Amino acid sequence: MYGATIGKLGIVGIKLTTNQACCACTPIFIYNKFLFYFLMASKQNFIEQGEGGAQPNISRIKLVNYLFPLPPLKEQQRIVNKLEELIPHIEHYSKVQAELDLLNRNIKEQLKKSILQYAIEGKLVPQDETEGRAEVLLEQIQKEKLKLYEEGKLKKKDLEHSTIFKGEDNKYYEKIGKNVTCIDEEIPFEIPKDWRWCRLGVLTIFLSRGKSPKYSEIKKYPVFAQKCNLKSGKLSLDAAKFLDERTLSKWRDEYKLRNNDILINSTGTGTVGRVGIFSEQILGNYPFIVPDSHISVVRTFSNIDSYYIYYLMCSSIIQQYVEDNLAGSTNQKELYIGVLEKLLLPLPPL
């Protein structure tokens, strides 16, 4: 009769009494099930007639005066019999419709995941052997690293190169310096012969978490945070905070985000692993933007298509790798840079 349960009803099978919150209807010359189904069909009307504030109620007088269509008793019974014949089918089709609605809501995301999986396995487009080999890209990257080392822009340890190859026993091995390790168990699927498996760290000229900023109320130098990486894959500065101008010297140029930088949320339950790709267009009139310590920046060498890496990072197999390798407690998951460096990727020719 009142509250959130206005209109709720049932048929009693035992002797009992009710309190003031319930209205008992004892039918005379009315089939009780017919009355039950009529009241059930009228539930929304009862709710709309409820009066009051926090605890709306419907009075007994309104129920007594509620118009009731009265067919003959045998007709009441026939109506009930037909309803009880149809209700199981209605419930079944309601369940099917709910499942169909859920499928329609999810099909776009599932289709996207399937297409991404076909793409990273080299099955989405025909393979053309005249387009070169991924091995050439890796050789170019190693030459570029050597050049940067000679210019003093890389350390000697950065020259250590991971090479993944298939041995004569048809198993995959990784060579770093003089050490060779079988990694066959890490390989999730076969790739076209002109492709190569490699670690993400090999393909990046800059792979780092951002820094912990000191903020300012002056809206001049925005800081890219987790909230800027939207679930849709788009980026937004609507929730960005701003850097204290007095701390600018803390941020080297390499921390200033550039076109096609891949940005990965690296902490936080529910958002860790979320991926975006940066475009300077979102800066508007801001001179630059830097990432905070909850964001990892993946900046590839120029001969690697950043969008290809971005879509790889969005794929279900990479997202599962991220999920499986998170550290920290349930409430504060964390994705370490070392996990990203070791991320195994299939690399096609450019």
Per-segment meaning from a language model:
Residues M1-T18, N32-Y37, Q44-G53, L230-L243, ...:
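Short, ligand-facing micro-motifs at secondary-structure edges
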Residues Y2, L16-C23, G53-P71, K211-S212, ...:
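A short glycine-rich beta-alpha junction/loop motif
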Residues T5, E51, L154-D158, N170, ...:
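Low-complexity, Lys/Gly-biased intrinsically disordered segments
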Residues V12-Q20, A24, E48, I176-E186, ...:
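Sequence-specific dsDNA recognition surfaces
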Residues V64-A98, R196, I309, K342-L350:
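Amphipathic alpha-helical segments
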Residues Q77, V96-E99, R105, K113-S114, ...:
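Non-catalytic DNA-recognition/assembly elements of restriction-modification systems
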Residues K82, I87-V136, L146-K147, L154-F165:
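Short amphipathic coiled-coil heptad-repeat segments
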Residues L148-Y149, K153-V202:
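Long, low-complexity segments enriched in small/aliphatic residues
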